[in-house]
Amino acid sequence: MNTTIKQLAQCAAMTALLGAGAAAHAAAAEPRIGVQLWSVKDEIKQDYAGTLRKIAGLGFQGVEFACEFGPYKDDPAGLKAFLDKHRLQCAGAHLHFDQLAPGRFEATTAFYRTLGCTSLVISMDKRGASIEGSAQMGKELTALAARLAPLGMTIGYHNHAQEFVGAVGSTPWDTIARGTPQAAVLQQDVGWTTFAGKDPVAYVQAYPGRTRTTHFKAKLAEGSSGTPIIGRDKTDWVALTRAVRQVGGTDWIIIEQEEYPDGMGQLDTVAASLKGLRAVLANPAAR
C-alpha cells in the first residue's frame, strides 16, 4: 500500500459509521456512460442538434450540460423531448452557486427538473483553493443538499487542481468531503486529480458512496509522456474503474475532453476516449 492510500485509509476509517449505506450505494447497477458537453463546446455551438445526434450515435447514454442549450435555452421541455427521441438522458448539469441563490433557485431548479436532470454540480469556485474557502463552501453545499432533497435532486462539487493542493488527507477536497453530508456528490475529475499529483483511486476509496458521478478525463501532468485520451495515458483506468464500481456508488462515468491531440476534432477525440473506456470496462480486472 503506497503512502497516499495509507494516509487516505485513515480518512476512510472516519466514515465507518456510514459504511452500510455506502455499501448499499456501491452495489448499484452498472454505471451509465455520458459525456460532458464542454468537451464539444465549439461543435455544439455550430450545430447543436446535429452534435447531440452524433453523440447519441456514438452510443453514449447521457449528456452532462454546461450552461449551453442552443435553441432550447428557454424550452427545457423541447430539449427533453429531443433527448428522449435520441435515447439520451440528462447525466447532470454544471452550474455556479449564484444560479441557486435566493431569487434564482426556483427558476433554475424548475428548468432542470423539466429537463429530467436531478444532479446539479458546482463546476468550480475560486474558494476551492483554500481550506477556509472550502469550509465555507461545505456549509453552502450542505444547505443546498437539504433544499434540493425534497425536489428529488442532489448537489455536488467538481474539482480542478486547486482542490488537491496540500498534504494527502488535508487538502481542500478533503475539507469539502468532511464538511458535507453523504448526499452531496463528490464529482471527482480524475484528470485534474492526477495533474495535481494525487491518486484518484485512493480518493474514491476514502469517501465510499460519494463518487456518484465522476469525470473520466486523461490529463497529463507537466513533464509526463502519453496522449490525453483514455487508455493512451498513464492513468490506471482499470484500478479506477474497479474502485468506482465497487466503492464509489457511481451512477455515471462522464467522459470529459479538454485537449485534442494531433489535430483531432473535438467529437473525434471524445470518440477515441469512449473507445478506450469501453476497452477498460470490458477488462475483467476492472470488475
Language-model segments: residues:
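Bacterial N-terminal signal peptides that target proteins for export
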Residues: 2-12
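Bacterial N-terminal signal peptides
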Residues: 10-20
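N-terminal pre-domain/capping segments
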Residues: 25-118, 275, 282-287
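Hydrophobic faces of well-ordered beta-strands that scaffold small-molecule active sites
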Residues: 31-36, 63-65, 90-95, 120-122, ...
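Acidic-and-aromatic substrate-binding clefts and catalytic sites of carbohydrate-active enzymes
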Residues: 40-46, 65-75, 96-104, 126-135, ...
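Active-site acidic/histidine proton-transfer and metal-coordination neighborhood
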Residues: 53, 82, 89, 97-185, ...
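Acidic/histidine-rich catalytic cores of soluble enzymes
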Residues: 150-234
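Aromatic-rich peripheral "rim/lid" segments of glycoside hydrolase catalytic domains that contact
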Residues: 260-287
